[in-house]
A protein has these predicted regions:
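Bacterial N-terminal signal peptides that target proteins for export
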Residues: 1-9
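N-terminal signal peptide c-region/cleavage motif recognized by signal peptidases
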Residues: 16-18
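N-terminal mature ectodomain segment of secretory-pathway/periplasmic proteins
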Residues: 22-97, 125-133, 139-142, 146-154, ...
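Acidic/charged, solvent-exposed loop-and-adjacent secondary-structure segments enriched in E/D, K/R, S/T
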Residues: 91-113
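Gly/Pro-enriched, hydrophobic low-complexity segments
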Residues: 136-205
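Short, well-ordered beta-strand elements
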Residues: 169, 292-301
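Short, solvent-exposed recognition patches
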Residues: 204-292, 304-305
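Short, low-complexity, Pro/Ser/Thr/Gly-rich segments in the mature regions of secreted, periplasmic
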Residues: 307-322
Length: 323
């Protein structure tokens, strides 16, 4: 019996040790995901699902000589597409003149995951390998980013096993319920850049404007500050500008944890108002009159209670300061 137990232990040792040695950590898998994005020529067809609505999209990437190009297009409804050529992003959206920003990033969480600062993100999220699965007919490894406090959504990513390319992204709430999803349905890894991306790289684009010059006002001290922010969030930008299509001037503040961006607007209340709340998938829009009789609007991919707590915490830094 003792000899049998020894043999079983030795067998288990030979089975388990190589598996542990070969299994990369969650952090290593996310690093591979970001390297893969910059390394491969590929086209990914995917859908964005939120509250029963499905939006088909296509994300493409290629390496052209010494340049790198990415293209994101929404395939239904009003035309929206975004072109990234090296560090310049061109925006093409229905109802707006096209424009190009230098030093910006493509909009949306899908693009944010591909370029996020992992070291910073790991300060407020714990990466965990949760297993293997299949997406779009391909084997994948699954990694979860669990928030270190319950004020934020968690994320689950599915990474194609051989390349590391991102194929699926889920946003989940504290209970694990799905809030929003990006799901790849077909991946094509190409031996060379597609003709489509080659032609886009040669297209005449709007003149690039540095992000710092895109605002009508320089970064300034608004005289307001949030008394509370979720773990990892810091103030990234502040300015004062008119709202698009109106003459109403608002104080603007953008906060971020390196993955999720939240916009905060403050303006003088023109009339008594009740609180307004709109939630679309992971995006919460909260509009309220705070204790200082100032209208506050918070917009971002955070749970409603978090948006409300941010809004309620805003306070003037000096008596008498109002938008």
């Amino acid at each position: 019996m003792r000899q049998l137990i020894r043999r079983l232990l030795l067998a288990a040792l030979f089975v388990c040790v190589p598996a542990a040695a070969e299994s990369p950590s969650a952090a290593a898998l996310l690093q591979q995901m970001q390297r893969a994005y910059h390394h491969y020529n590929f086209e990914l067809s995917l859908i964005k699902v939120r509250q029963g609505n499905i939006e088909p999209m296509r994300f493409s990437h290629a390496l052209l000589d010494k340049s790198e190009i990415s293209h994101l297009i929404y395939l239904n409804g009003r035309p929206s597409e975004y072109l990234k050529l090296d560090d310049q992003i061109s925006f093409f959206e229905a109802g707006h003149e096209p424009y190009t920003l230098a030093g910006a990033r493509m909009p949306g969480l899908w693009s944010a995951f591909l370029t996020m600062n992992l070291e910073r993100v790991f300060e407020s999220y714990d990466p965990v390998v949760t297993g293997r699965n299949r997406i779009a007919g391909l084997p994948v490894q699954v990694v979860r980013l669990a928030p270190k406090e319950a004020t934020k959504y968690g994320f689950v990513v599915w990474l194609e096993q051989s390349s590391g390319l991102l194929l699926r992204l889920d946003l989940i709430d504290e209970s694990g319920a799905l809030v929003e999803q990006y799901m790849g349905v077909e991946l094509r890894v190409l031996p060379e850049p597609s003709r489509w991306l080659k032609s886009l790289a040669q297209a005449k684009l709007p003149r690039a404007v540095p992000v710092a010059q895109a605002y009508q006002s320089p970064q300034l001290d608004l005289g307001w500050a949030p008394g509370w922010l979720p773990k990892g969030f810091v103030i990234m930008s502040t300015d004062r500008h008119p709202l698009v299509g109106t003459d109403q001037v608002v104080d603007y503040m953008m906060i971020s944890d390196g993955l999720v961006d939240v916009s905060i607007y403050l303006s003088a209340a023109e009339a008594p108002m009740g609180d307004e709340l709109v939630r679309q998938g992971a995006t919460s829009l909260l509009r309220m009159l705070n204790d200082h009789k100032v209208e506050v609007t918070v917009v971002g991919e955070v749970p409603v209670p978090t948006a409300q707590r941010i809004a309620e915490s805003l306070h003037p830094l000096a008596k008498g300061i109002r938008p």
